[in-house]
Amino acid sequence: EKFNRMFPIGLSKLPGIGYILTGGISPLSKRYGLAIDNLLNVKGFFGNGDFFSLDIDNLNKKEIPIWEGIKGAAPFFSIITEVAIQTFENFPIQVFDGFVKEKELKELIGISETFPKNFSFQFIFSDNIYVYIVGELKTEEEKNLAQKYHSIFQRFPSLKNKIYRNLNQINFFPKELNIFELNANFHSEVISLLGKSLKGYESEFVEELIEINAAKPNKACYVAIQQLGDQSMFENKYSSYFIHREACWKPWIFASWEKNNNHDKKVVINWMNEAWNRLKRFFPYIHLAQLHNHLNSHQDELKLAFGSKLDELKDLKRIYDPSNILPPL
């Protein structure tokens, strides 16, 4: 704020280092890319205890595979203690948001598939559906384009329209959804998926969400989605372990239950897995934003997240975490 700069944060506002290193998808990722593609410097320790400090502009041949591994798969062979990231100048943000009906959601998904890189779409599907359309207004052309969308979105009377000074001013998802209260008596799991365009499948997708929501075991379970694409499809000078660069959508399934209630936990995890199975045809890949080495799905998730690069990751782990101190592959 002091320097009128920002970093493309996620929907939970204050990003931790885990958000950055697992990929880091923001409402502005279509313009600025993923968080891992904006890394400049990384410090930390390997699983074998050795310290490292890497700078993107001063990598030797041996360090390049390490840098690439840190971008999306760091927890398996390293502990990161410090990062330096590229920041960007702040610009006004136009937001259209509100509760919508299932039919309106289908139409909005279709409209969002044609958005330019400065606009993105995200929503949460629970007992009610709440959507966010976020647009950065950097140029006069983009301000004029925002007026065009304002006219289009007037067809959706529940959508509010507001311009914020910058992205940091926005509080995503209202308390009226009644699902975000931090409760020490509940545990949760999240599984994140990745997939290509939904063009032509908007209706089928929303119908699946309706059935998934109807089957949820409690009000704290939900499905949400973020749009990516454009700049997030491109890596910077080095590759990464976020391999599914063709992805246009990242849905996540949030599953929560009362702690120490093993029956509820089993029911909720089963619901999460069933929701995943239902959504696989639209989103066949995994964004490994949360590790599940304690769940039966861990190996499948690794394969769907890293694909053919999994063997390279195993090589990094063998070299830098030979005692398997860090999460397993």
Model-predicted regions and their roles:
Residues 1-329:
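Soluble FAD-dependent oxygen oxidases
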